[in-house]
Amino acid sequence: MTSRKTRKLVRAGLAALAVVPMLALAACTASGTTSTPNAAPSDGVLTIGLLGDIGQPPDPDIYYANNGLAIVLNTYEGLVQYKNDIDTVEIAPRLAESWEVSPDFTTYTFTLKPDVTFHDGTPFTSAAVKSSLQRRVDVDGGAAYMAAGVASVDTPDDLTAVVTLSEPNSAFLDYLASPFGPKMVSPTGVEENAGSDNAQTYLQTHDLGTGPYELSAVEPGAKYTLTQYDDYWGTKSPFTTVELPIYNDVSALQLAFDKGDVSAIVAALPSSSLDKYDGNAAFNSDMLPTLQSALVTVNPSKPFFAEKEARLAFLQSIDQEKLVDQVLGARSEPATTLYAKGMISDGSDKQNIEYDPTVMADYAKTLPEGSEMVVGYASGNTNAEQMANIVTANLQTTGIQATAQSYPTSQVFGWANDPTQGPDAFIDGNNGPDGGNPYMWGHVFWDKTGGINYFLCDDPSTDADLNEAVKTGDEALFAKAAQTYSATGCYMNLSYNKDWVVSQKWLDGVAESHNIGANELDFSLLSIAE
């Protein structure tokens, strides 16, 4: 149940795909906001603006990154998903109508939806479940771990798939519901276009899913186009075409939206733009639930934070409530737990870091004069940059020579190879787990093999507890793991973040098309308001 594959920083929260020109952004947020709604399209085209290119091919067994999920989740479907339009984690049907789980969490039996076809015309049957899970393992992309524990898939009939795991795993349904989870891929299409790479080349510019839309045109760096699948089994929207143009800076994206050239922007605008759209009669502004947070991680391989005393003092110096309110505003609230909000039902993962700047001030007096430290943030992340500047300014009042520094995403993920090359601490403006099970949070962020433990701050007992807890879903053991890891002083959950979606006034169904697991919309559930 471990993985060293890395996942790119989530969505615009930490996407180093675009640099924000701050003066231009300030200008477009300060004035010129229209209060007259733009006209709805009459040609059946929905336009979703992307901030930066998608970074990886939209192959569901490869893609493990940011805004390209808008393509993956509208062209492919899994057996289950997280339920739309609620603020809690609940598994809902997709291509499986129902399922049964054995008491020991080793056997998962799915009853499949009938009369579903892939975009190449191949019927969706239990054979496709078997081949799709196998392809996930064979391709060995970033989220291969979600199928790595599958021992066998039995297909007693076309509409029944029995998945047996090699060991108990209570998180398996969450793996399948994850936006990065296994999606169903046409076995015929894969075989016909296999080439030498299991159809990976083909799926760079085509799709083989069952979703409401087909990938019809790919212009890397410029635009992606989806076309409605005529034989889709589910709800169809009035939008027969979805265009996803790419913008390389947020001000250009925002201006296009203001003019009506873009229908909606999902999780891409900085919090500094909140006031512009809140209550504006021309636009919708929706704050939708997610599992994501702003996070602080501390680097124990750096001399400044070699001792736990220093790490804990630093975390106590952060005025969490003020920082979240000042920078993130209405899209966030201060986090009170170590996992995502509500992930542990009784709240026993309570975060016990209390703001007390005197602890760091006293510790600073023991340091050599002029001691330096660096707080990092991802390039292009306006929110994280502002938070890093505030944190370092406060540290400077203690005599510590603290500075804030930006790092490109590629460099951030290189730190796991040598944490000494990283900063002393790092602020994630927005990051989250692969799914709604506590294991998918703790393993990813706290285990050095999990993928987003940048500085490899690892506690073996935490890892052992997580690996044991996932077998049965033992919340008490998950909570124990969280408290043990928190005591290392390597981690702080700053805020619970919401997915901020701005859309034209004529666009209806935004909340209904969104679920807590992904910062994306199901385009088939969108419509034009009457």
Stretches with model-predicted labels:
Residues 501-530:
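Long beta-strand-rich cores associated with HINT superfamily self-processing modules
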Residues 145-193, 217:
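Surface-exposed binding/hinge segments that line
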Residues 58, 301, 305-343, 386-387, ...:
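Periplasmic-binding protein-like
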Residues 329-366, 379-386:
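Structural transition elements
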Residues 404, 410-412, 440-505, 529-530:
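Extracytoplasmic/peripheral linker and loop segments enriched in polar/acidic and small residues
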Residues 180-235:
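Gly/Pro-rich hinge or "lid" segments in bacterial periplasmic/extracellular proteins
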Residues 201, 229-275:
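Ligand-site clamp/hinge motif
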Residues 49-101, 134, 208-209:
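N-terminal lobe/hinge region of extracytoplasmic solute-binding protein
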